[in-house]
Curated annotation (Swiss-Prot):
The keyword Signal applies. Mostly expressed in immature seed pods, and, to a lower extent, in stems and leaves. Present in phloem and epiderm in leaves, stems, flowers and fruits. Disruption phenotype: Reduced organ length (e.g. inflorescence axis and roots). Keywords: Signal, Vacuole. Involved in organ growth by promoting cell elongation processes. GO terms for molecular function: structural constituent of cell wall. The gene is GRP5. Its main location: other. It comes from Arabidopsis thaliana. This is Glycine-rich protein 5.
Length: 174
């Protein structure tokens, strides 16, 4: 009986401690999210035009995870997992610069994880035009495709900078 009582007491104390911890963690999480919203905020947001994690927009026109620079965009307008890029100095996780974009494409000065170098329409997971570069940048010339597409001009940068035209998983314009 004594062990059963001890077990019940331990259970009560444990559940109380867990509840207190969870409420503190929840408050911290909420305040952290608010800080992030403030830090990453750009006009607009979500999956459309405007903000998201990058400049430009969400997964659609202009941005996504990188709008211009960062995880997917090159330099200039566009970015994200497949949005356009633009002219300029390129960089980020995948997009080069120039007309390309997406996870590897790009023209212009290119760079990053898979962005090519040189000119052309670029795009896709490793396409692009010109001299190629990075972990997936191709060579050749002409208008790529795949997850890439897009157009525009300007310079991007950083984890989220940049703006301009572009498209989501293949859209954009030349």
């Amino acid at each position: 009986m004594a062990s059963k009582s001890l077990f019940l007491v331990a259970l009560l104390v444990g559940s109380f401690a867990f509840t207190s911890f969870a409420s503190v963690a929840n408050r911290k999480l909420k305040s952290g999210l608010e800080d992030q919203k403030t830090f990453f905020h750009h006009p607009g947001g979500g999956l459309g035009g405007g903000g998201g994690i990058g400049g430009g927009s969400g997964l659609g026109g202009g941005g996504g995870f990188g709008g211009g620079g960062g995880l997917g965009g090159g330099a200039g307008g566009g970015g994200g997992l497949g949005g356009g890029a633009g002219g300029g100095a390129g960089g980020g996780f995948g997009g080069g610069a120039g007309s390309g974009g997406g996870l590897g494409g790009g023209g212009g000065a290119g760079g990053g994880f898979g962005g090519g170098a040189g000119g052309g329409s670029g795009g896709g997971f490793g396409g692009g035009a010109g001299a190629g570069g990075g972990l997936g940048g191709g060579g050749g010339a002409g208008g790529g495709g795949g997850f890439g597409g897009g157009g525009g001009s300007g310079i991007g940068g950083g984890f989220g900078g940049g703006a301009g035209a572009g498209g989501g998983f293949g859209g954009g314009h030349h």
